[in-house]
Amino acid sequence: MAMQKIFAREILDSRGNPTVEVDLHTAKGRFRAAVPSGASTGIYEALELRDGDKARYLGKGVLKAVEHINKTLGPALLEKKLSVVDQEKVDKFMIELDGTENKSKFGANAILGVSLAVCKAGAAEKGVPLYRHIADLAGNPDLVLPVPAFNVINGGSHAGNKLAMQEFMILPVGASSFKEAMRIGAEVYHHLKGVIKAKYGKDATNVGDEGGFAPNILENNEALELLKTAIQAAGYPDKVVIGMDVAASEFYRNGKYDLDFKSPDDPARHISGEKLGELYKNFIQNYPVVSIEDPFDQDDWATWTSFLSGVDIQIVGDDLTVTNPKRIAQAVEKKACNCLLLKVNQIGSVTESIQACKLAQSNGWGVMVSHRSGETEDTFIADLVVGLCTGQIKTGAPCRSERLAKYNQLMRIEEALGDKAVFAGRKFRNPKAK
């Protein structure tokens, strides 16, 4: 089925920054997709095109990307008469038309917006749910509902506190269904709010970009202690484990790490990667930490490799791998991590996202699908995670509608699958393992 019309506009994301939305029309109707954007971005990500006009949205407008769709990409696709079910052909055509390594001509935000809309239209054309269409594109006969990783305490670049590490997450792996995982997550979240309020006062329960709390604490183990207390208070010590996103590239200074990077710089307090690794091992020993993302800088390969060889938990590459097949291949070869964080806007098309996921999975890695801190009401990644069978998703706390949009969509998908629904649970690292 051919595309009839492609129209892009500038909308606002959950942080009040402009982003790209695309409407694609076929005989089956209108299909709409919106593109997310990140706060802590890896230097190897595909280029998000911003206008740079300081007099408008502080330089963050996306009118150029919108114009690239309306004037160039859209007309070229309509002229080419490609079918919306041919996701790979459509994406390949756009990437070749752009012609740059990092999509800097049109912007990854322009190409991805069209790619997402095409995927939704393709599902409608086939008369199947989006998650089923994505599973077909990936060659997956099965569907798996993921364990949600709720980011409930925020630090790093996501929060105005002194906490260096960016995210502290709870994963209800002991739940029997996605719906139960949501309930457990929400209950722990409310208990955590009570614990923080009692210890730090009411204003400590304001929420960050992703719906988590950002109490003004400095010590990272204090955040873990708060989680442990809340999990106990909610009554789920046997069902909930902890994940972290350190985003260490944000506090990497001249080969060392600064765990107090929001204070005036003092090289005397910087620590080595090895020392930081010892701190993580301490966390793993004292708390139910099962996953650590970006524990070291995106170019500190040697430290990643030596750390991975000494632990048996999940080590996730985000800034390290940026959903990019070349970086993933490098990380596989160096044995730097064992899980890929999959962000569609880091690579900039549906086809390349699926390829990155399959590359990681074929090397025995886990894959965690992820939102960005600047999100929209778009729910594409909920269907993506089910179709790709990755078994884990992080899309914020159970708070703020742009986060709940994804979680609620996952509950609907589970409901639609009925007794065929499979929840990853404790097998979240490798849900396809029999």
UniProtKB/Swiss-Prot annotation:
Mammalian enolase is composed of 3 isozyme subunits, alpha, beta and gamma, which can form homodimers or heterodimers which are cell-type and development-specific. In vitro, interacts with several glycolytic enzymes including PKM, PGM, CKM and ALDO. Also binds PLG and troponin, in vitro. Interacts with PNKD. Glycolytic enzyme that catalyzes the conversion of 2-phosphoglycerate to phosphoenolpyruvate. Appears to have a function in striated muscle development and regeneration. It comes from Mus musculus. The modification Phosphoserine is found at residues 83, 157, 176, 263. Keywords: Acetylation, Cytoplasm, Glycolysis, Lyase, Magnesium, Metal-binding, Phosphoprotein. The active site is at 210 (proton donor), 343 (proton acceptor). The lineage of its organism: Eukaryota, Metazoa, Chordata, Craniata, Vertebrata. Its cofactor is Mg(2+). Mg(2+) is required for catalysis and for stabilizing the dimer. It catalyses: (2R)-2-phosphoglycerate = phosphoenolpyruvate + H2O. This is Beta-enolase. It is an enzyme of class 4 (lyase).
